[in-house]
A protein has these predicted regions:
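Extracytoplasmic small-molecule ligand-binding "clamshell" domains
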Residues: 1-55, 63, 125, 189, ...
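Short loop->beta-strand "edge-of-pocket" segments that line small-molecule binding or catalytic clefts
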Residues: 2-3, 12, 90-106
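Ligand-binding cleft/hinge of the Venus flytrap
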Residues: 4-7, 19-29, 105-126, 155-159, ...
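Hydrophobic residues within well-ordered alpha-helices
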Residues: 22, 44-45, 92, 136-137, ...
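Beta->alpha turn/N-cap motifs
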Residues: 33-38, 47-59, 82, 100-104, ...
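A ligand-binding cleft/hinge motif common to bilobed small-molecule-binding domains
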Residues: 39-42, 54-64, 108-111, 135-170
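Flexible hinge/capping segments at coil-to-helix
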Residues: 69, 80-97, 187-188
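Periplasmic-binding protein-like
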Residues: 73-80, 156-195, 213-218
């Protein structure tokens, strides 16, 4: 629910609406591009993009970018098939999982950062959420992991075939990333604009429109 393209080719989602409103308040018109997420650093460095705004976690990357935010908080969670014998993170030991490449969930499952999960048999990294969901639907993996809103939407649309684990993988702060050493003033202005949007209820209204609990994420 953060950013996607609908059947009419329009960009939709929480981040799309937040970015549009924030930049409008600052006197800019937001333009959006969908990119292969693993190429984000290159595209930002070469100037093909001005910023990254797509459910992007600040934790552990504080010194890698010029940041605006945090503007939302997100849990990283795990989903499994309803008939799975996986009920807790410890049950993932020796199992196969799928994540989106270069995300916080991938870092946790690959033990690149502090991780509450045991060693898995296999971690598959995909470019898109569609590939991620298909891997679980087709039984290629035992579990998938990612941002709570994204995984919850998948589970809710799964006709009872999937469920969430109660435990969180990780709690992350979401921010807007600009290339390090550039746009510092713009990032600071954006942070102040986002704070104003939180104070006047705009962020709450937008996230609740997409089914999120504002008390947990704002």
């Amino acid at each position: 629910p953060y950013s996607s393209v609908d059947e009419n080719g329009n960009y939709v989602g929480i981040d799309i609406e937040l970015a549009t409103e924030a930049f409008n308040r600052m006197g800019y018109q937001a333009e959006f591009q969908m990119i292969p997420w693993e190429e984000k650093a290159r595209l930002l460095a070469e100037g093909s993009l001005d910023c990254l705004w797509s459910c992007f976690t600040m934790n552990g990357r504080e010194n890698d970018y010029e940041w605006a935010g945090p503007y939302l908080y997100s849990r990283q969670v795990v989903a499994v098939r309803s008939d799975s014998q996986i009920y807790a993170l410890k049950d993932l030991e020796g199992k196969r999982a799928a994540v989106q490449a270069t995300t916080r969930a991938s870092g946790v499952l690959l033990h690149e950062i502090a991780s509450p999960v045991p060693q898995l048999k296999q971690v598959n990294c995909f470019s898109t959420t569609e590939e991620l969901f298909a891997a679980l639907r087709k039984g290629y993996v035992d579990a998938i992991a990612g941002h709570e809103a994204m995984i919850t939407a998948f589970v809710k649309g799964g006709n009872g075939n999937y469920r969430l684990l109660e435990e969180s993988l990780y709690v992350s702060e979401l921010g807007v990333a600009f290339e390090k050493g550039t746009h510092r003033e713009l990032a600071e202005r954006l942070t102040e604009t986002l704070k104003a949007m939180e104070a006047d209820g705009t962020i709450t209204r937008i996230v609740e429109k997409y089914g999120l609990d504002a008390a947990k994420v704002v």
